[in-house]
């Protein structure tokens, strides 16, 4: 049986929008520009300026709806500006980009992404994380191919809120730990072997360049350390996602994530936690849950040191999650919609998962008390 894999192309730099026409014009002349409100305010003018003097025609800025939901995808699909376009430019953060993936796939249009945050790998992955309109996780949409090209404008990313890069570091540094756990004791074929190997390349750049990248973004300055972190978050982590997930008939596998992301989805049912804390922030605490579940105490101690240095969460209090909410969280983690559940080589009950959360919290409080 044949197997195909679509991988992304990318451009990064303060002037990378100069490359837009080069990589898009072969797909047509009309682009629907869809994204978040703030992202469109920051990027639309720069995109339009880069395409001035070409035959590319941009739509007016189109708000994606504010949530990565199928309802918003349907709303966008019904718009004439979207239906009449040859391609879609997805501008903004993960939820805006993921909504556009569904729209582009359903309408059969080429998709180009313009991340304005260094917070996640959505800009170069085929999958889309979809939610109900109220923000509770619904499912993962598996697209057949990645976006055609990802344009990461360093100046625009540098002007974004620092907490998004901070959260992106917390999210992407999970790749090595999660893919190792998910693939442990498995016999891997070519592509997932590549993916789990590339996952190891996420960790060092984020640990080495993360502190300096945070200094730069707080100062609203572009720089090589910021670029290295953005590349690790958007591209390296994205490549891992593309190479560790397959829904191709006869070639299904999933080694992309495990307990840390299961914790994130679990936390979406806790209103205060979900409302006030980002995806990456919760995944970072989920890494501690993973290590507690795996009883990997030495790794947990080392990650606590990094998390503390980056001000990532170490306790339930840090993420506004209450102990009485844990049974509902564990039930959500074990829901069939959460494909990360069970991506470990041993039996885990909902009670075990809740206990691992409590253990991570306990050890976090002990770590802080020891300082």
Q: Where do the model's predicted regions map?
A:
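ATP/NTP phosphate-donor binding region
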Residues: 1-86, 316
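Solvent-exposed alpha-helices and their adjacent loops that cap or buttress functional pockets
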Residues: 2-4, 24-26, 80-83, 104, ...
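C-terminal charged capping/lid subdomain of soluble metabolic enzymes
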Residues: 3, 19, 172, 296-371
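A glycine/threonine-rich phosphate-anchoring loop and its flanking beta-alpha core
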Residues: 8, 105-202
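Short glycine/serine/threonine-rich phosphate/pyrophosphate-binding segments
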Residues: 17, 40-44, 95-102, 120-124
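A short, small-residue-rich loop immediately preceding and capping a beta-strand
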Residues: 80-103, 107-118
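Active-site segments that bind and position negatively charged phosphate/pyrophosphate groups
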Residues: 189-306
């Amino acid at each position: 049986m044949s197997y195909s894999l679509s991988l992304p192309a990318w451009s990064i730099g303060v002037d990378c929008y100069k490359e837009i026409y080069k990589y898009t014009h072969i797909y047509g002349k009309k682009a629907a520009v869809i994204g978040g409100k703030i992202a469109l305010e920051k990027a639309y003018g720069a995109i339009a300026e880069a395409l001035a003097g070409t035959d590319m025609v941009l739509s007016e800025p189109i708000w994606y709806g504010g949530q990565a939901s199928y309802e918003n995808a349907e709303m966008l699909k019904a718009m004439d500006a979207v239906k009449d376009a040859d391609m879609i430019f997805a501008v903004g953060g993960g939820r805006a980009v993921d909504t556009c993936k569904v729209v582009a796939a359903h309408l059969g249009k080429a998709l180009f992404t313009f991340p304005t945050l260094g917070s996640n790998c959505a800009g170069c992955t085929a999958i889309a994380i979809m939610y109900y309109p109220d923000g509770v996780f619904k499912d993962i949409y598996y697209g057949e191919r990645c976006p055609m090209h990802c344009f990461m404008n360093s100046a625009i990313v540098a002007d974004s809120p620092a907490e998004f890069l901070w959260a992106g570091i917390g999210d992407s540094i999970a790749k090595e730990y999660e893919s190792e756990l998910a693939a442990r004791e498995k016999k891997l074929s070519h592509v997932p072997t590549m993916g789990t190997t590339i996952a190891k390349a996420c960790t060092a750049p984020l640990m080495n360049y993360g502190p300096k990248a945070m200094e730069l973004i707080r100062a609203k300055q572009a720089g090589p350390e910021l670029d290295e972190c953005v590349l690790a978050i958007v591209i390296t982590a994205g490549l891992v996602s593309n190479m560790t997930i397959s829904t191709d008939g006869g070639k299904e596998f999933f080694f992309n994530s495990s307990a840390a992301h299961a914790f994130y989805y679990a936390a979406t049912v806790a209103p205060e936690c979900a409302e006030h804390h980002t995806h990456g922030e919760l995944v970072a605490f989920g890494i501690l849950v993973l290590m507690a579940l795996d009883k990997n105490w030495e790794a947990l101690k080392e990650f606590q040191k990094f998390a503390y240095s980056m001000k990532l969460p170490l306790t339930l209090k840090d993420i506004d999650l209450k102990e009485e909410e844990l049974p509902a969280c564990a039930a959500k983690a074990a829901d069939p919609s959460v494909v990360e559940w069970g991506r470990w080589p041993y039996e885990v009950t909902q009670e075990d998962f809740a206990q691992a959360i409590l253990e991570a919290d306990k050890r976090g409080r002990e770590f802080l008390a020891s300082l």
